[in-house]
Structure formats: structure tokens, C-alpha cells
Amino acid sequence: MTNNPLIPQSKLPQLGTTIFTQMSALAQQHQAINLSQGFPDFDGPRYLQERLAHHVAQGANQYAPMTGVQALREAIAQKTERLYGYQPDADSDITVTAGATEALYAAITALVRNGDEVICFDPSYDSYAPAIALSGGIVKRMALQPPHFRVDWQEFAALLSERTRLVILNTPHNPSATVWQQADFAALWQAIAGHEIFVISDEVYEHINFSQQGHASVLAHPQLRERAVAVSSFGKTYHMTGWKVGYCVAPAPISAEIRKVHQYLTFSVNTPAQLALADMLRAEPEHYLALPDFYRQKRDILVNALNESRLEILPCEGTYFLLVDYSAVSTLDDVEFCQWLTQEHGVAAIPLSVFCADPFPHKLIRLCFAKKESTLLAAAERLRQL
């Protein structure tokens, strides 16, 4: 008999506390302005809050259906048709999840088998690779290069093999703030049309797109959407990240497999929040239609305030993130620079290398501009002093 605790063998031994948690803790410790984690410092729509309170008061406090509240799924179907010219079946094609990250995990788990290869574009959101690993998959990474982070389709085609099972893309792209165009989806289809390859399109920033052509969705591509999962987030759209409500749209056979995983992860999602979101989609569709201008103004406030700094600003076509090059300021690597920036100058940012598996030689950091104007101007004032 031993008193030593039984320690499990880690399935993810290379992972620890995320950089986002680390930088937010460091920001709090040094009372820094937090432009690191991607959440607003302002509240969401008053109408949405009122509808949540209404449904709580009306007793909608028990489990929702596993697939999501019917009214919300129907509202999502109508919105999808309005935006992308395709109406998914509310009963068989749409699943409401506990945030977009759960949708991503459930979709990856449903589609990836042991030994399957999954192509990801680096820099990439940090939840993809662990989910792939837990399903026994192998991540094949394609590095996108600054400042434009475009896909080289010849290089992509060379990555394909008989074991390629899935491609994960993200548009608008976190952290690079670039967007896919319809030509990119056409090129993707040309590359995978002859293969049994699925697609997950992470479109959580679909309504924060500043490009002239607007958001290009996999759901607007007739061939790709037959083998694709589109993932979206109400938290990003309505400035309510703490509600953790997202959804995915996929053809019925794929959705059926996703739901098998979803029912044993969370089973169902916050009932009054779903009902409130259904009300919001029906009553105020102009909210998400106004988001590009809303966040473009915030982007421009930060960009204009940084014009006289020594930071080089990279193009920002979407999301609420901005990349800046600090080569003229410091020779530190990006992790050390972010620590120094937080401790010595009171601004927290995210190093871009944490989004990449391979060594990242560029001196780039990510700033979040989903903040009040006063927050952005105060941060810019400190950054101009570098």
C-alpha cells in the first residue's frame, strides 16, 4: 500500500496552460491593458439580455433538445439561406453546441479515425491539433507566410495522400486577420474533388469581414458543402462569449455522426440562451449585418492611433484581431516580447508563434480590438512609447 497519488499517463503530454490564460493572468498581475484574449470589454445587445431574463422567468430552465431548440435551428436555417443561398434542413443538418469549440471537437471526433491525416493551415487555432490527436489522427501542417497568409495551392496538393481524411480551414482567419475568397474554395474543391476528404470550415468570425466581396462561406459552394461542416459562434456575433453557444451546419449523414459525439459531450445547451438567440435572430437581423462597420471603426481607431509608433501594421481583412511587427522595437522572440510588453509597458498581447507547431521566425504579435474606444486609445498611447 502506498500513499503516493496515482498519476494518469497524459494523452496530451506536450500541452500545459494555454498562452491565453497565461497572458491574461500576467495582465491582471501587472494591471496591464488586456489586448490578448479575444473577448470584448463591452456588453452585448440589451434586447438579447432582456429575452434571456424573460425565458428564465417563464420557466424555460430544463434540458433543451439534444440537437438544439427548434426555434433556434429554424432561425439559423433561414439566416443561412438569406446569406449564402442555401437552406439547410433545421431538423437534420443543424446542431447547436456549447460554443464553437465543442462543435469543432465533435466534428473532428466524428470524422477522424486512427491514422487519418488532417491538413491544418498554420498559424491555426489551438484547439484543432489536440482534438485530432485524441482521435488518433496525424496533423499535416501547411505554413502560411506573412504578410498576406495566402494558401499556395500547389503546395497544398503536394500534402494530399491516400491517408488524408480532413481539411480544417478558418475564415476570417484567427490570428492572421485574412479572409478566404470564393476562388479559394474553388481551388480547394479542384484539389480534393477526386478524394474522399471532408472539410471543416471554422467561420466563427463570419460577420466580421471587411473585404469588398464580403464573407465567402463553404456553405455557398454547392459541391463542397456536401462534404463540409461549417462552424459558427453566437458569442462572437453578439459580444457574449461567456454564453458559450455555437452551432454547426452539415449534411444529414455527417450531422448524424457529429450528434453521436455531441450527445455524450454536453448532450444539450443552455435553454433560455437558445430561446433568446432565436428571438434575436428573428427580431434584429440588422445586428449581424452591421458588424463589419462596427468592428471596422474599432480597427481603424487602433490602426490610426498606432500610425506614429514603431510597430508595422499588417493588413486586417476580418476578425477583431490585428497583427503588428515589432522588429523595429526589439530583438526578443515573440513570447519574451509579450512578457516584457505586459510587465514593463502595461499592454498584454499574444505571440504569434503559439499558433504554429514549427519555429516561427517572424516578430509578430496579435492585438484584440474588440474593446471600448477608451481602452484602444489608452493601449495605443503606451505602444507609441516603445
Curated annotation (Swiss-Prot):
It holds the Pfam family Aminotran_1_2. GO terms for biological process: biosynthetic process. GO terms for molecular function: kynurenine-oxoglutarate transaminase activity; methionine-oxo-acid transaminase activity; protein homodimerization activity; pyridoxal phosphate binding. The keyword Cytoplasm applies. Its EC number is 2.6.1.88. The modification N6-(pyridoxal phosphate)lysine is found at K236. It is found in: Cytoplasm. It catalyses: a 2-oxocarboxylate + L-methionine = 4-methylsulfanyl-2-oxobutanoate + an L-alpha-amino acid. Keywords: Aminotransferase, Cytoplasm, Pyridoxal phosphate, Transferase. Its main location: cytoplasm. GO terms for cellular component: cytoplasm. Belongs to the class-I pyridoxal-phosphate-dependent aminotransferase family. Homodimer. Shows aminotransferase activity with methionine and histidine as substrates, and to a lesser extent also with phenylalanine. This is Methionine aminotransferase. It comes from Escherichia coli (strain K12). The gene is ybdL.
